[in-house]
Every structure is written in structure tokens, then in C-alpha cells.
């Protein structure tokens, strides 16, 4: 079981206590800059040491989705947004098998090597993975779904992938709509639990909204996905329609409207944890104005990048690889080579006009040495 948050009394269900801290507080507490390489390659879970190689199959057996030449399956859920787009995508099957213990046991005093924090291919992806993981325990707890990732202990529904954007959270997998309905519509068992009721339907998904009117909150439930919107600043139903429409092919997708984004996804979007942005350039005034961004690529070397996709893939119990793709106005190849994948080995950085690609590898031995320095 994960440790209690600081300054909180011991409680067996501390994730579900009413005065739960903000996502930012918890990210800081769990060490948001702890890298996936550190989480996975140091003290890897026993599950990761099975004979079966983790992450070797791109086919998702749980929900039947398969990455195609047109892009990874999660990309179908990313609608064309006239503003900007940020996302975090997690192959939960792989991450759960490999690093679930490390995700839960991360401590605030974990020493993270400075070179990891300074590497755009490591820190942002790691923060994204933790954000997606913690969203379920934090944000979904208010709907009675806070333990959805707990390996069948509380739910018959199973999770294969997680997708987070600033407006929405998508749980992909084998979902039992009746089970979710029972949780959402149940009489609240605690003060902080919000009761919902079925009020609408969108393209085969049953839509639930709070019994007590709350702007910006709606949950769509289907047998292959659970789509959550909980942001009072948006029209929740419109957001659901846009995202479900993209997934069903009845609304425009970001990948279809942007050649640079499609290229970046094809190049670097196939990892076990993937983050990306399309829109406000990294380091721009528009990006700086948003102090709570989902994806943080605020590195001087990436200033002016309008499209970025970065991913980490778990190859086995000892090795992770990273892939990076960006479209940057007037990129500085020397400066980029100093940071992209610099904390790993087998580093490669290539600049072709405005297109930048990079790859690197992180091995258990290298990570262990870095943490001792």
C-alpha cells in the first residue's frame, strides 16, 4: 500500500478521504520528476521479471484496439482543437506489469539525478505518467471510481490504456457499463462522493451528470471506454461529443488536420508512455500564461516548438528506450544534442529543416550509477 500523504492521519483508504490534496500537491509529494527509467529500472516489480517480455506486442487484447500505419489507437480519441492540444497516453497493461509498485512507493525525498531532470526526453514523460496514474485515484474517487486500476480487486472492468488531456480523461479497456452505472448512481457513502444520474446518450455511450447541478461535469460510459469531463470552465457535453465523435470517426481528429502532428505521432508516438502537444509553442508567452499545464516542455532548447511528441518504451526488465519528434522553428542542433537523451546511452539527434528527431536508451546499470553520483 502506498504511504499516507504528509500531515495526514493514517487511514487504510486515504485515497478516498474527503479533503484530498490537489493534483499538484500529490505530484510534488510522490516526486513528479522521478523518471520512468528510475521507476522501472531500479527495483523492478516481480511481474516484470516473468519470462514473457513486456511491451513486445502492439496489439491491445483487452479492448481490441491495434496501432495502425495511420497512428497509434489513442490518437483516434484526440479531436481537432482550434486552440491547442496536450495529451498523455499510457499503456496501463505494460506499466502496471512493470512499475506499479514503484509508482505507489515513490517518496518525496527520492534523489533524482540532475541529468534526468534536465532531459526533455525523461522528466516530462515521467510527470505525464504520474499525472495519468494519479488522476484515477484523485479525481475519479469523487465518483466512486478511485480504485479502478486496482487489478480486479474492486471492479470487474479492466483497464488497458489511459489517455489524459486538459479537458478529459479516457479509460480504455473492457468496461462493464452496468457496474459503472451502479457506482455512479449509488447513494453517496461519504460526503465527498458525488452522485450522478443518466441524462443523455452520445453515439452509443450513456452520459451521466451530477444529480446536484454542476457545470462542466459529465461521464460517458461505453463497453470499450469511460470518458470523464470535470472542468467547470468547459461545456462538458460538447467536449464529450467532440472526443467521442473523433473516436467514432464522425468528428475531425487532430491527426487528420495537422501534417506535422501526424508525422510526430508516427515517429515517436508508439511508446508505453507518450506525451505531446500541438499549438502554443513551447516557451511562448501563451504557454507561460498557463501555470498548470498538463505537459511541460519549457526547455530553452525547445523554444518555438509548435509540435512535440515524446515517449518511453519498456523493452525488458533492464532497458527502456525513448523516442522524440518535434517541429521547431530554426532549431539549434548543437544545443538540442546537449539535452535530448543526454542522460541515456546510444543517443542520436537528427535535424532535418524544422523537423527534429532523437532516440536514446536507458539501462538499469546506468540509472543506478547516476543515482549514486
Where are the regions a protein language model picked out?
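Soluble, non-membrane globular domain cores that form compact, hydrophobic packing
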Residues: 2-167, 172-373
Amino acid at each position: 500500500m502506498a504511504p499516507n500523504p504528509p500531515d495526514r492521519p493514517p487511514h487504510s483508504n486515504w485515497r478516498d478521504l474527503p479533503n484530498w490534496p490537489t493534483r499538484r500537491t500529490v505530484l510534488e509529494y510522490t516526486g513528479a520528476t522521478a523518471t520512468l527509467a528510475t521507476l522501472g529500472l531500479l527495483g523492478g516489480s516481480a511481474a516484470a521479471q516473468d519470462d514473457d517480455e513486456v511491451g513486445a506486442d502492439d496489439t491491445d487484447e483487452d479492448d481490441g484496439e491495434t496501432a495502425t500505419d495511420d497512428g497509434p489507437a489513442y490518437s483516434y480519441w484526440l479531436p481537432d482543437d482550434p486552440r491547442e492540444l496536450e495529451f498523455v497516453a499510457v499503456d496501463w497493461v505494460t506499466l502496471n506489469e512493470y512499475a506499479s509498485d514503484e509508482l505507489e512507493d515513490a517518496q518525496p525525498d527520492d534523489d533524482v539525478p540532475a541529468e534526468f531532470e534536465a532531459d526533455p526526453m525523461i522528466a516530462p514523460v515521467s510527470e505525464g505518467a504520474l499525472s495519468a496514474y494519479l488522476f484515477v485515484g484523485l479525481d475519479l474517487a469523487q465518483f466512486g471510481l478511485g480504485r479502478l486500476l486496482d487489478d480486479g480487486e474492486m471492479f470487474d472492468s479492466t483497464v488497458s490504456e489511459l489517455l489524459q488531456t486538459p479537458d478529459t480523461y479516457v479509460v480504455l479497456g473492457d468496461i462493464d457499463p452496468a457496474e459503472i452505472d451502479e457506482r455512479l448512481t449509488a447513494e453517496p457513502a461519504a460526503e465527498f462522493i458525488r452522485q450522478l444520474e443518466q441524462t443523455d446518450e452520445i453515439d452509443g455511450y450513456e452520459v451521466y451528470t451530477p444529480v446536484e447541478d454542476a457545470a462542466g461535469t459529465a461521464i460517458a460510459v461505453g463497453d470499450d471506454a469511460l470518458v470523464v469531463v470535470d472542468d467547470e470552465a468547459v461545456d462538458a457535453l460538447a467536449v464529450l461529443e467532440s472526443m467521442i465523435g473523433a473516436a467514432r470517426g464522425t468528428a475531425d481528429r487532430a491527426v487528420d488536420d495537422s501534417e506535422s502532428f501526424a508525422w510526430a505521432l508516427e515517429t515517436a508516438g508508439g511508446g508505453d508512455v507518450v506525451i505531446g502537444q500541438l499549438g502554443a509553442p513551447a516557451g511562448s508567452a501563451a504557454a507561460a500564461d498557463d501555470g498548470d499545464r498538463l505537459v511541460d516542455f519549457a526547455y530553452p532548447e525547445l523554444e518555438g516548438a509548435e509540435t512535440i511528441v515524446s515517449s518511453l518504451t519498456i523493452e525488458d526488465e533492464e532497458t527502456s528506450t525513448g523516442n522524440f519528434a518535434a517541429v521547431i522553428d530554426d532549431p539549434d542542433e548543437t544545443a538540442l544534442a546537449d539535452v535530448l537523451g543526454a542522460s541515456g546511452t546510444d543517443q542520436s539527434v537528427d535535424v532535418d529543416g524544422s523537423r527534429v528527431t532523437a532516440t536514446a536508451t536507458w539501462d538499469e546499470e546506468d540509472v543506478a550509477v547516476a543515482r549514486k553520483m
